[in-house]
Amino acid sequence: MGDRRTVKTRSAIKEAFLRLLERKSINNITVAEISELADIGRGTFYLHYRDIYDLYENIENEVFGQLGSFYDASFPSENHPVSLLAYIEQSTEYIYENKKIFALLINRANNTLTLQKLKELFKSKIVHIISIMSEGKVSEYDTVVTAFVISGVVGVLEEWIGTGMVKTPKQISEILHKVLLKLDF
């Protein structure tokens, strides 16, 4: 993957795909269209991805991996003080900087599983925080609160992205942080 040509080709494929995704649903995009727009052969596409859905999943994994790395940086160890605001701020800033990708990813016409994957990412992170705070004991109450929080956070982010991100990342972060601090974990 370190080969510059490989990186450049993958980038061209992703950009072409995202441009097409702005105009069409994922089900109506062909490898031939991506290849033509990226100025590559179809065979080159298949050297990098199995199909269009593999490409889509690769993009999802890339952006969700970045969100996960922000969490790891905000909560480096179990003995480290919890830094929820830092995580929220980094995440909303990243989403804002990549608004085109996120707007396309959360579009239900493209794939409803994206929101579910985002919920799963946040669930794993919130359960980790609760586990640290409760010395490894996650109660049934914690599980219900986690589901509630995740749906709320993802819903707020979906609304924020879907309405053109009128509020700044800092404003959204502060709102989410304030709401989360009011909950009894």
Regions found by a protein language model. Name each.
Residues 109-134, 143-147:
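Amphipathic alpha-helical packing segments from all-alpha helical-bundle domains
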Residues 16, 48, 58:
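Residues in the recognition helix of alpha-helical DNA-binding motifs
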Residues 20-53:
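Helix-turn-helix
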Residues 72-97:
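Hydrophobic alpha-helical connector segments
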Residues 138-146, 150, 172:
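Membrane-interface starts of transmembrane alpha-helices
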Residues 30-31, 59-71:
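Short, basic, alpha-helical segments at the C-terminal edge of helix-turn-helix-like DNA-binding modules
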Residues 151, 155, 159-185:
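C-terminal peripheral helix-coil segments that are non-catalytic and often amphipathic
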Residues 1-24, 37:
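Basic, helix-initiating cap at the start of DNA-binding domains
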